[in-house]
Amino acid sequence: MQRPRILHIFSRYGEVGGEEICFHAITEALGAIADVTPFVYSTEELFHSPHGALTKMGYLLHNRDVEQKLRKCLRENRYDAWIIHNTFPAMSPCVYELALHQPAPVTHYMHNYRSGCLNGVFYRDGAPCFSCQGGNYFPGIMHACWRKN
Protein backbone atom coordinates (compact mmCIF):
# COMPACT_ATOMS: atom_id res chain seq x y z
CA MET A 1 0.00 0.00 0.00
CA GLN A 2 1.30 3.44 -0.94
CA ARG A 3 1.93 5.87 1.89
CA PRO A 4 -0.10 9.08 1.78
CA ARG A 5 1.76 12.22 0.68
CA ILE A 6 1.26 15.25 2.91
CA LEU A 7 2.28 18.83 2.20
CA HIS A 8 3.08 20.41 5.58
CA ILE A 9 3.17 24.22 5.42
CA PHE A 10 4.65 26.59 8.01
CA SER A 11 5.63 30.26 8.03
CA ARG A 12 8.54 30.71 10.44
CA TYR A 13 8.69 33.74 12.67
CA GLY A 14 12.00 35.40 13.53
CA GLU A 15 12.27 33.44 16.78
CA VAL A 16 11.48 29.81 17.56
CA GLY A 17 8.23 29.50 19.49
CA GLY A 18 5.49 27.05 20.32
CA GLU A 19 4.07 26.97 16.80
CA GLU A 20 7.40 25.95 15.32
CA ILE A 21 7.98 23.29 17.97
CA CYS A 22 4.50 21.93 17.23
CA PHE A 23 5.19 21.96 13.47
CA HIS A 24 8.37 19.89 13.90
CA ALA A 25 6.70 17.44 16.31
CA ILE A 26 3.81 16.87 13.89
CA THR A 27 6.20 16.49 10.94
CA GLU A 28 8.11 13.82 12.85
CA ALA A 29 4.98 11.99 14.02
CA LEU A 30 3.38 11.99 10.58
CA GLY A 31 6.63 10.74 9.08
CA ALA A 32 5.95 7.36 10.69
CA ILE A 33 2.82 6.84 8.57
CA ALA A 34 3.14 9.18 5.58
CA ASP A 35 5.58 10.86 3.22
CA VAL A 36 5.70 14.42 4.54
CA THR A 37 7.04 17.35 2.53
CA PRO A 38 7.73 20.35 4.76
CA PHE A 39 7.19 23.67 2.98
CA VAL A 40 8.71 26.39 5.15
CA TYR A 41 9.17 30.08 4.44
CA SER A 42 10.67 32.43 6.99
CA THR A 43 9.65 35.92 8.01
CA GLU A 44 13.39 36.65 7.86
CA GLU A 45 13.42 35.79 4.13
CA LEU A 46 10.76 38.43 3.58
CA PHE A 47 12.16 41.14 5.82
CA HIS A 48 15.77 40.68 4.69
CA SER A 49 14.95 40.50 0.99
CA PRO A 50 16.23 43.22 -1.34
CA HIS A 51 12.66 44.37 -2.08
CA GLY A 52 11.60 47.84 -0.99
CA ALA A 53 9.31 48.50 1.97
CA LEU A 54 6.17 48.95 -0.16
CA THR A 55 6.80 45.70 -2.03
CA LYS A 56 7.33 43.86 1.25
CA MET A 57 4.08 45.29 2.60
CA GLY A 58 2.30 44.08 -0.55
CA TYR A 59 3.77 40.61 -0.01
CA LEU A 60 1.78 40.39 3.24
CA LEU A 61 -1.30 40.30 1.00
CA HIS A 62 0.19 38.23 -1.84
CA ASN A 63 3.74 36.89 -1.70
CA ARG A 64 4.78 36.10 -5.27
CA ASP A 65 7.99 34.36 -4.13
CA VAL A 66 5.98 31.91 -2.01
CA GLU A 67 3.45 31.41 -4.80
CA GLN A 68 6.20 30.51 -7.30
CA LYS A 69 7.95 28.12 -4.88
CA LEU A 70 4.66 26.46 -3.94
CA ARG A 71 3.61 26.10 -7.60
CA LYS A 72 6.98 24.44 -8.33
CA CYS A 73 6.43 22.07 -5.42
CA LEU A 74 2.95 21.20 -6.75
CA ARG A 75 4.28 20.58 -10.27
CA GLU A 76 6.84 18.12 -8.89
CA ASN A 77 4.55 16.28 -6.46
CA ARG A 78 0.93 15.31 -5.95
CA TYR A 79 -0.34 15.46 -2.38
CA ASP A 80 -3.15 13.58 -0.67
CA ALA A 81 -3.54 16.22 2.05
CA TRP A 82 -2.30 19.67 3.05
CA ILE A 83 -1.64 20.78 6.61
CA ILE A 84 -1.20 24.53 7.06
CA HIS A 85 -0.03 25.98 10.36
CA ASN A 86 0.09 29.66 9.52
CA THR A 87 0.75 31.98 6.63
CA PHE A 88 1.24 35.28 8.46
CA PRO A 89 3.21 37.32 7.90
CA ALA A 90 5.60 35.86 5.35
CA MET A 91 3.54 33.54 3.16
CA SER A 92 0.31 35.47 2.60
CA PRO A 93 -3.16 34.16 1.71
CA CYS A 94 -1.85 32.99 -1.70
CA VAL A 95 -1.30 29.61 -0.02
CA TYR A 96 -5.07 29.22 0.43
CA GLU A 97 -5.74 30.46 -3.10
CA LEU A 98 -3.55 27.65 -4.46
CA ALA A 99 -5.05 25.10 -2.06
CA LEU A 100 -8.56 25.85 -3.36
CA HIS A 101 -7.54 24.53 -6.78
CA GLN A 102 -6.10 21.24 -5.50
CA PRO A 103 -8.07 18.02 -5.02
CA ALA A 104 -6.50 17.37 -1.60
CA PRO A 105 -8.26 18.25 1.67
CA VAL A 106 -6.74 21.05 3.76
CA THR A 107 -6.35 21.12 7.54
CA HIS A 108 -5.47 24.43 9.17
CA TYR A 109 -4.04 24.46 12.69
CA MET A 110 -5.18 27.54 14.59
CA HIS A 111 -2.36 28.27 17.03
CA ASN A 112 -3.61 31.84 17.44
CA TYR A 113 -6.09 34.24 15.87
CA ARG A 114 -3.61 36.16 13.74
CA SER A 115 -5.67 35.59 10.59
CA GLY A 116 -8.23 38.02 12.03
CA CYS A 117 -6.08 40.05 14.42
CA LEU A 118 -2.52 41.26 13.98
CA ASN A 119 -1.55 40.60 17.60
CA GLY A 120 -3.31 37.23 17.52
CA VAL A 121 -5.44 37.62 20.66
CA PHE A 122 -8.33 40.03 19.83
CA TYR A 123 -7.29 42.24 22.75
CA ARG A 124 -5.86 45.78 22.72
CA ASP A 125 -5.41 48.53 25.28
CA GLY A 126 -6.97 46.49 28.10
CA ALA A 127 -10.16 45.54 26.26
CA PRO A 128 -11.44 43.10 23.62
CA CYS A 129 -10.88 44.37 20.08
CA PHE A 130 -12.33 43.02 16.85
CA SER A 131 -11.40 45.92 14.55
CA CYS A 132 -9.38 43.76 12.13
CA GLN A 133 -11.75 40.81 12.06
CA GLY A 134 -12.83 40.30 8.49
CA GLY A 135 -9.46 40.99 6.92
CA ASN A 136 -9.07 44.78 7.15
CA TYR A 137 -5.79 45.10 9.06
CA PHE A 138 -5.58 48.88 8.81
CA PRO A 139 -6.73 49.44 12.44
CA GLY A 140 -4.08 46.97 13.65
CA ILE A 141 -1.43 48.76 11.64
CA MET A 142 -2.51 52.14 13.01
CA HIS A 143 -2.43 50.84 16.60
CA ALA A 144 0.91 49.01 16.08
CA CYS A 145 -0.60 45.73 17.22
CA TRP A 146 2.03 43.45 15.66
CA ARG A 147 5.37 43.62 17.44
CA LYS A 148 4.53 47.20 18.44
CA ASN A 149 5.33 48.25 14.82
Predicted feature residues:
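Amphipathic coiled-coil/heptad-repeat helices and related helical stalk/stem segments
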Residues: 23, 66, 91-92
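Short N-terminal targeting/anchoring amphipathic segment
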Residues: 8, 72-91, 105-111
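Glycine/Thr-rich phosphate-binding loops of Rossmann-like dinucleotide-binding domains
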Residues: 16, 92-93, 116-117
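Residue-level marker for beta-strand->alpha-helix junctions and adjacent short loops that shape enzyme
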Residues: 13, 43-46, 89, 113-115
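A short, charged, and often flexible helix/loop element on the N-terminal side
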Residues: 42-73, 84-86, 146-149
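N-terminal subdomain of nucleotide-sugar transferases
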Residues: 1-44, 75-77, 95-105
